[in-house]
Structure formats: structure tokens, C-alpha cells
Amino acid sequence: MSDSFNLPLRPLTEKRERPDPLPVEIAQINAQYGSFRDVTEDSLRAKIEADKNKDPWFDKEENDNASADEDTTERLDQLYKRRAAITQFALQAHMEAMFALDFVSLLLSKHTPRQAEMSMSAYLKQVAPLGSLNSEIVNPPPKPESAARDTKNVSRGWRLQNFNSAASKLLDSATRLEAEVASETRYWDEVLAVKEKGWKVSRLPRERQALGVQYGFLEATPIFRDRGLAALRRTNDGSLILDKGLIPLKARTVRVRVRSRGQITGCSKNQPASDNTESIESRILQARDTVYEEELFHELVREARILGSQGVTTRQNLVQFPVSEEQEVLLDLIDSDQISPENDVVSSNEHAVVADALAHAIRILLAYAHRQNLRRRTQLPTPLTPKRRQTPEYQLLRPVMAYLQHSSHVRWLESLLNDINQILKSAGITCDFTATPFSSLSLRRTISGLPKVEALVQEFLLPYESTFSAQLVTPQSSFRVKVRTNVTTPPLGTHYEISVNMPQYPDVRPPNRIGLQDEAASILTHFVLLDILTAITHAKGSSVKGIKQETGHLLTWQAAYPHNGELLALSSTGQHKKMKVSLSRHELTVRVYSIRGIDGFGKPAVDKTPAMRSQTWKCDGTPDQPNLMDFIAEVSKE
């Protein structure tokens, strides 16, 4: 390749062969200042100073002041005079134009009389015949050499000036083109970098000459799907800017808080901001996250409107639903840098993990809803009907509410059974309680045709079930409790299904479905109480859970009113006794009374004296406290 070389665009300027002639300069001085006798150095300096200090607006101001002093009448007369002058000038110009037209027409009538006659005036046709005027070419007199040289110099000057102008324009265009090339190169490099990172770049639907990046989710609702496309604009230096359109400038996020007993005890963590917030990648990610968070809160509000019967409330920018009597969850859409007011300050981080888990759960459920939309869209469409198909609300709040409510009921039931078990242990009775929380969940279950992620999420959309079982004091006595929570299909809420196996009371059957915790607690404690009464009636001469009882001179207890916890012991000496047994989650109490006999209604007549003996067992039993069977053996003596 040949070496590069510089090609100058501007013409080379040459010095004049000789200066301007002196007679020309003298003529210019005489025309400007007059005779040389009147031109002195002082007069020239005074003229220069006067030109420097002269105000260019002075004459205009004088004219304005003079015109302002004229009255209205003079201005009106002046207006009419100027109008007449303008009209006269127009008529004179028209007349001169007609004279010129007649002259040219008469001159052309020598050669083309028919065409020239059409442009002649009527007066000229009368006074001058056609072809009476002719023209000849006369050679001009030869110009002197000085005039030809001056014309040549002027032409050369004009050419030099035009060359300089063209060179300046070419250099400016080259500079502008170089800057434009650098700007375009930087723009396309950044566009290519955006595409290489996995973002979809395409033309805008309504602006075909511009490029856009698709950062939204195609399976979102139409209002948020259309907002997921932003234009990639180019600045003057070629860098990319993201035209977000309706997307807010600040990042927004859905905040989850847990309120317990009126205090905020947990708050979800905001997503940490990127280190390089000015990069196009961080701006695209911020726009994507903001659209996703706004769609998430929009769907939460839509779902909350149909869950009003389950305690879900919405007000302004807040969604609130209860978990238990003392705990509730708050969800709101805030700016990432928003500062919480004083009444919403987090008092502790007791439930911070729960808040973070809920925040992740609702986002995963929204992504699962997007996948379900894609699955429905790829399947065969349903037949067309005149009725418009409604878009169902996404299941975002309902699975979360079901999990929290079910977990709350499971913890309550575990606490109840543990308390009863501790009371029985303090009374010397051993029972086996077994708990299987969330027994319905099978994380290893696979569904044909579904990815593992969707199959895993689908497990949490089904009703939750937990199973509790217990082997009671007497052999073959047991109960089983199934806790079931469902917030998607009826029956809604949490229900307890209790099944009992008590051979001593075969007719005792619990209700099919129990919805209140107090009712479930009373039924379970009642069944345990019946089993304790059965153990007391079989205590003489037998062993209960490995405990040997004394057999000499002991009364035999019989269940008089077992559902009221009353036992009766009849003695041959007439010293009858009555036992009252009561059980709650806090204590087990046994009271023994002496009775005179049986009244006419078959009921024992209790003495009005206080109880002979009384014993209470609690969760934190004392070491010197006798167990239940020892106490029964002692009060059974005649």
C-alpha cells in the first residue's frame, strides 16, 4: 500500500507582484478627505477618536424621540402622503415595465412578428409598424490592459474566496462526520453489549427507526407487558440512555412486614442497589424489577378484593391480612430509599426471617403464574363463546395465608398436646403423642409433563394437612387429629377432623368437622379425661402403664357421670365417696368428697362439708407431689 499523503484543500495565497498603484490611493484620499492641505495628523487622530466614541444607536434614538413628539394629526397626514407615494411608485414601475415590454416586442417583431404582436400594447401598434426597429451586433472597443488585469485580479480573488469557503465546509463536514462515526460506534457497541447479556433488542412497534430493549415479562398482564419495552436512545456522545416511559425514576419494591401485638417485629430486606448505577445494565435491571414489583402489588390488590370475607383489607397503598389473633401481615409498595415513619419503625427482628420468606414466596408465585399463562397460551384455544372470558386472580395471597394459618394452628395444637402431656407426666401417667406437621407436602413428588420447579410450587397450592396421634393411658385407647387448611376452594379456613378409638365408650363420636380452637381443645381434653376415668376404674388389682397398685381394703371406683368427670365408690360400712376429676391444658385436679348415701333420684347425696382430699397437678409439678395412682390408692382406703 502506498504511503499516505496530505492534500491541502485551501488554495495557496501568493503575494502580489506589485502593490496597488499610487494614483489610485491618492484618488481615494481626495474623495474621502478632500485636498491634502486640509489633512493633518491631528485631524486624522480626532476623526479616529470620534469614530470610536460614536454611539451607533444615537441617530435611531433621535429619530424615535422626534417621531414620538408628533401628534396624531401629523402622523395621519404623513401616513396618507406615504401611501400616495407608494402608489405613485408602483404606477411608475408598472409604466416603465410596460415601456420595456413594448421595446422588446417591437425589437423582436423584425424576426418573429406574430409572437411579438401578442405582447405589444394597442398604442404601440398604432404608432409603429411591425419590424420598424432592428438591432445589430457592434464590436465593443478594446479594453485597456490595466482594466483586463484588474478584472483578472478580481476574478482570481473571487475564486480564492470560494475555494476557502469550500475548504472550510469540507473540513467542518469531516470533523462532524468523524464525531458522528465515533458516536455511532459507541452506540452500537453498547447495543451489542446489551444483546450479548441476554436482553432482547428489537425495533419499536410505533417507532420503526428506533431500537428498544424488552426487559418486561411477555406473560404478564397487558398493561405491564406493554410497559416492559423501552427505547434505547442515543445521546450526543453516543452513550445509551433508557427511555423508560411510564416507569418511575426511582426503584420500587413490595415490602412485607409482620406486626405482633401492635409492634412491627419483622420487615423484609430491600434488594441491595448495584454498585454501578449509571450503567445501562443496572438501569435495565432497575426498570425490570420495578415493573415486576408493580405488577406483583397490582395482583395482590386484585386478589385481596375477593378475600374480604377472610379478613383481608386494603386501604390506599396497603394490603393487610391476619395470621392469628395477635399477629398480622402488612404488604405495601414503597420506593427503595423510602424512610419509614416513626409509628412503623421495626421494634425487633423476631419475625424478620418470616417476612423475608413471605417476600420471596409471593415473587415465586407470580413467576409460577407467568409460567401457567405461557402453558395455557401454547395449548389449543378453547371454543369461541359470546361471553367474555374473565382473567382469574393469581394465587399469591391465598397460599401464603393458608401456610401461615395452618402453621399457627399446628403450633397451637402442639402446644396444647405438650401441655397436656406435661400435666400427665407430673401425675405419673405416660402418654405417647406423635406430631407430623405438613404431612400432605411431598417435596420429592414428580408430576409427568411438569418441570420440577413447577411441581414443587404446585405442592404449596394444594390444601395443607397435618396429623397428630396419641396413645392414651389405657390400652387400645387412642385418638387422631387431622388439621386441614384450604383457602382456595370451599370449605375455606382451617378445620380439625378428630377420630377416637375408645372401647370403653364406643358410642362417643366427635363432630365431623371442628372450626374453632376452643372447641377442639375442649373435645381433646374431654377424651383424655374419659381415658383417665377409665384408668382409675381399672386401677384396683391391675397395672396401668407399668404401675402396680395395692389390692388390700381398697374401694372400687365406678363411673357415675363420666362426661362430668364424676366417679362413685360404694362402701359396705356406709362411708361412700365421690370423686370429681377435671382436666384442662393448665392443670389436672382430683377432688374426693364423702357422701351419706343415694337420694331418691339415684344421685349421691354429698355432705355439705368441704372435700376430704384434693390434689392438683400442673405442668411444672413439684418433686414431693404424689402421682395420680398413689393418690387414688390413698383415698380409696376404707
From Swiss-Prot:
<keyword id="KW-0010">Activator</keyword>
<comment type="subunit">
    <text>Component of the Mediator complex.</text>
</comment>
<comment type="function">
    <text>Component of the Mediator complex, a coactivator involved in the regulated transcription of nearly all RNA polymerase II-dependent genes. Mediator functions as a bridge to convey information from gene-specific regulatory proteins to the basal RNA polymerase II transcription machinery. Mediator is recruited to promoters by direct interactions with regulatory proteins and serves as a scaffold for the assembly of a functional preinitiation complex with RNA polymerase II and the general transcription factors.</text>
</comment>
<feature type="region of interest" description="Disordered">
    <location>
        <begin position="1"/>
        <end position="21"/>
    </location>
</feature>
<dbReference type="GO" id="GO:0070847">
    <property type="term" value="C:core mediator complex"/>
</dbReference>
<dbReference type="GO" id="GO:0003712">
    <property type="term" value="F:transcription coregulator activity"/>
</dbReference>
<comment type="similarity">
    <text>Belongs to the Mediator complex subunit 17 family.</text>
</comment>
<dbReference type="Pfam" id="PF10156">
    <property type="entry name" value="Med17"/>
</dbReference>
<keyword id="KW-0539">Nucleus</keyword>
<keyword id="KW-0805">Transcription regulation</keyword>
<dbReference type="GO" id="GO:0016592">
    <property type="term" value="C:mediator complex"/>
</dbReference>
<keyword id="KW-0804">Transcription</keyword>
<protein>
    <recommendedName>
        <fullName>Mediator of RNA polymerase II transcription subunit 17</fullName>
    </recommendedName>
</protein>
<dbReference type="InterPro" id="IPR019313">
    <property type="entry name" value="Mediator_Med17"/>
</dbReference>
<dbReference type="GO" id="GO:0006357">
    <property type="term" value="P:regulation of transcription by RNA polymerase II"/>
</dbReference>
